[in-house]
């Protein structure tokens, strides 16, 4: 059974995600559809790219990943397929898919050109349902990418910005905030552990305010209500509050800069 995943900024209040799933199942009846997230901040391509990039390794080989964070929908921007060794990516040509594609050594990019494998009526504002969902379904059914599109090299490139060391500081930013209010940063586990040991106290600067915090293995090693640093399940530094919300406590938002003073 083929797996098709969905990642969007559509939310679940409206019928958009359900319509995409309906289109997929009308074409490929035996696929398994899995939601990665539909709570990407509206039009935030970087956040969407990060969530896709960090989710890819946990799906079976041959999975088809549809990602739609598409502020340029209905314009001249292309729809593309990125063919990687172990998975396929479908979505808009705006950089959203590229970090996930770069996880594999080599990939090919196809511009979606065939009208045969999309809906008869394509709206200007909902290519997720009208283009990308049916394309993913037909790929799951075994239609070759060469029949759907043409190979291109002029796709929009994009690289995620990861945390880095600047003199005696580690600089990063918030990529994502989960439902617990944890601030998921772009600072990778390997970088943190190169400079900071578990149990060490350091200064955290965020939104111009300084906090003295500990780097701990998990929440339970801190006191209730205490701010802490930990490595989250996807391998990046998170700023948390034990049994609380770091987002609310620190007044932080996606895109805010984070500084750790070594």
Features from the language model and the residues they span:
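Anionic-ligand-binding alpha/beta catalytic cores of soluble enzymes and soluble regulatory domains
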Residues: 119-187, 191, 196
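Short acidic, Gly/Ser-rich segments with clustered Asp/Glu that frequently serve as metal-coordination loops
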Residues: 10-14, 72-74, 177-182, 244-246
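N-terminal glycine-/serine-/threonine-rich phosphate-binding loop
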Residues: 1-76
């Amino acid at each position: 059974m083929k797996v098709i995943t969905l990642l969007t900024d559509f939310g679940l209040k409206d019928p958009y995600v359900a319509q995409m799933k309906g289109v997929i199942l009308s074409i490929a009846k035996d696929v398994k559809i899995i939601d990665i997230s539909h709570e990407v901040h509206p039009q935030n391509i970087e956040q969407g790219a990060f969530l896709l990039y960090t989710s890819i390794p946990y799906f079976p080989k041959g999975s088809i990943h549809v990602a739609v964070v598409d502020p340029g929908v209905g314009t001249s921007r292309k729809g593309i397929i990125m063919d990687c060794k172990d998975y396929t990516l479908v979505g808009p040509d705006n950089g959203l898919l590229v970090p996930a594609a770069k996880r594999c050594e080599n990939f090919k990019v196809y511009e979606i050109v065939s009208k045969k494998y999309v809906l008869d009526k394509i709206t200007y504002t909902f290519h997720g349902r009208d283009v990308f969902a049916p394309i993913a379904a037909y790929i799951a059914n075994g239609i070759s990418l060469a029949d759907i599109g043409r190979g291109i090299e002029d796709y929009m490139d994009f690289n995620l910005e990861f945390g880095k060391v600047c003199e005696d500081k580690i600089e990063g930013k918030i990529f994502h905030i989960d439902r617990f209010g944890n601030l998921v940063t772009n600072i990778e586990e390997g970088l943190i552990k190169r400079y900071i040991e578990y149990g060490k106290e350091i200064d955290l600067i965020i939104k111009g305010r300084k906090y003295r915090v500990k780097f701990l293995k998990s929440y339970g090693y801190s006191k209730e209500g205490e701010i802490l640093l930990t490595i989250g399940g996807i391998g990046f530094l998170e700023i948390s509050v034990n049994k609380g919300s770091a987002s609310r406590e620190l007044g932080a938002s996606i895109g805010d800069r984070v500084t750790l003073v070594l």
